[in-house]
Amino acid sequence: MAKERIVLPSAEFKKNSNITLKDYKSLYKESIENPNKFWAKEANRLTWFKKWTKVLNHDFKNAKVEWFKGGKLNVSYNCLDRHISTPLKNKAALIWEGDNPSESKVLTYYDVYREVNRFANVLKKYGVKKGDRVLVYLPMIPELAITILACTRIGAIHSVVFGGFSPEALQSRIDDCKPKLIVTADGGFRGGKPIELKRNVDIALEKSKEDVKTVIVVRRTGNESGLVWKDGRDYWYHFLIGDPDLSPYCKPESMDAEDPLFILYTSGSTGKPKGVLHTTGGYLLGVNLTFHYVFDIKPEDTYWCTADIGWVTGHSYLVYGPLSNGASSVMFEGVPSYPDAGRFWDVIDKYGVNIFYTAPTAIRALMREGLTHVQKRNLSSLRLLGSVGEPINPEAWEWYFKIIGKEKCPIVDTWWQTETGSIMITALPGAIPQKPGSATLPFFGVQPVLVDNDGKEINDKGEVSGNLCIKSPWPSMMRGVYGDSKRFFDTYFSQFKGYYFTGDGARRDKDGYYWITGRVDDVINVSGHRIGSAEVESALVENRSVAEAAVVGFPHDIKGQGIYAYVTVKEGIATNDTLKKELVAIVEKVIGKIARPDVIHWAPSLPKTRSGKIMRRILRKIASGEFEGLGDTSTLADPSVVQKLIEDKRKFHS
């Protein structure tokens, strides 16, 4: 194995950093040995209407966790109200850059405060109360941030659905969370192309068993030619928020620390997406504290997280983390390749971005474009880079460090999940030396362990590998799967008793650094977004020609993992490119373009045990081009199937 490179923070960065290595070690020790004391102190970063009576109450074996019992606060108050009586009132809160470079808008903290108050009153006018769900299906426009903050102001639970999801995927989320109201747009733009949103909502509601009485529509494209309007249900956002009789102030609801804040759907290893439920106090503290330390935020910084708010990264590190810290956050509607592959670098120069947080997928795609676009831009404003969504391979790390950061910007390679709410394992810039490809060390209060398949902790010195689990609760952890407490326990706490199981594998090196090795369950990480194998398989078998399908992940140069589908057709059906196109189309229709298979491998049959279980381990290896060391195949009902799949892989998919 090649010698690991260690990258130390520069003397200048260390001098001005929010934390030193010595302080990290002592604070981390306190956070593990005395979590009550540590978190009681850190909770003072937030404004509470009423102080808690108990910091932590938990029974991890039975998945019961409660933080800051009795404490009362409001998220929108912490993100807005407490800033507008300070000089932050006129500071940029959201810097919006449209899909088209000619469109941009800056909203100060007071601008956002004003809009959030008004829209909170609109929601109340249409019957939304504390505890009601509001489903949000919007493009990356300021109204998306305004809508979710307005929900938090009145105690409504928001559930944002990524605008790239299909009407069917949208319908499943409507059926599950039963929203009182939906906020959408007439459409959106992505890479210069219009995208359907209102039409998708119409289709989803037609098929849904839920009777949603109110749909509020933001005008984004202005194209009303194909817009279907249902009087008495559909209302224009700008008419409602511009109502002269609307009160300009909405008193923030006093929320219990454990009151639900939002539901965000994520893929699981079974077919049905699960609604990850986050609560108010612990979540906000987690994103507030991590944002301060991980991104080394300073009052004058302009910070840009490129994630869509439809994913957890956008919730935590575009909206709630930055705004609760009084930071200026860039919000980008577009894609890195439009109008050309220099768009990211243009935005950085346009706004003097200091901190840039993006996904390895984007970095790898931009690496492929060569240096032409980068060399035309300045990028001298950058001082810190971040990576999120999947492990970053050392080659991409080095390119990011040398070409984008000019070897002066530390990189925070952050490991966390929708379920964890906030960053769990990361370097702290200026404090923790980095190793390209390693997520490095745990954040305060996070106690990662590696366990073997029997659930025993692996405490050996030196390099070890195992299942990555968390040993004790942290404030921003999910509190449940919405409406399904059994699934919450079964998914995260049943496999290794007394531990939260992340679903990831990892290795820990001799220095205690963690290296994430990928999913160990049936979830595929495509461009940092989780796609459940079962979801894609269910979509494929909807085609009448398909008898059976098995879907696995395989290494992909750009996306990290691609989707590899083994498909068995029914007797007498011809396999051809037309059928392949039909299968790709049905996956796009049922889930969305993000889940389209990269490879469709026609399989005469699948490797199964005598009990009928598909041996996915073997399918993963074949998809990855690993034909040796397939393990024991003697338990297969027909071992010859494996050789046929290998031959076809070599012949047609090499």
UniProtKB/Swiss-Prot annotation:
Any one cellular-component term (Gene Ontology): cytosol
Annotated positions binding Mg(2+): 541, 546
UniProt cross-references to InterPro entries, sorted A to Z: Ac_CoA_lig, ACAS_N, AMP-bd_C, AMP-bd_C_sf, AMP-binding_CS, AMP-dep_synth/lig_dom, ANL_N_sf
Sites of N6-acetyllysine modification: 613
Cofactor list: Mg(2+)
PTM entry text: Acetylated. Deacetylation by the SIR2-homolog deacetylase activates the enzyme.
Binding site for CoA: 190-193, 313, 527
Acetylation recorded as keyword: yes
EC number, as in UniProt: 6.2.1.1
Superkingdom of origin: Bacteria
Annotated GO biological process: acetyl-CoA biosynthetic process from acetate
PANTHER family: ACETYL-COENZYME A SYNTHETASE (PTHR24095), ACETYL-COENZYME A SYNTHETASE 1 (PTHR24095:SF14)
HAMAP family, per database record: Ac_CoA_synth
Family to which this protein belongs: Belongs to the ATP-dependent AMP-binding enzyme family.
Protein purpose: Catalyzes the conversion of acetate into acetyl-CoA (AcCoA), an essential intermediate at the junction of anabolic and catabolic pathways. AcsA undergoes a two-step reaction. In the first half reaction, AcsA combines acetate with ATP to form acetyl-adenylate (AcAMP) intermediate. In the second half reaction, it can then transfer the acetyl group from AcAMP to the sulfhydryl group of CoA, forming the product AcCoA.
Protein's name in the database: Acetyl-coenzyme A synthetase
Organism in which the protein naturally occurs: Leptospira borgpetersenii serovar Hardjo-bovis (strain JB197)
Classification of source organism: Bacteria, Pseudomonadati, Spirochaetota, Spirochaetia, Leptospirales
Protein encoded by which gene: acsA
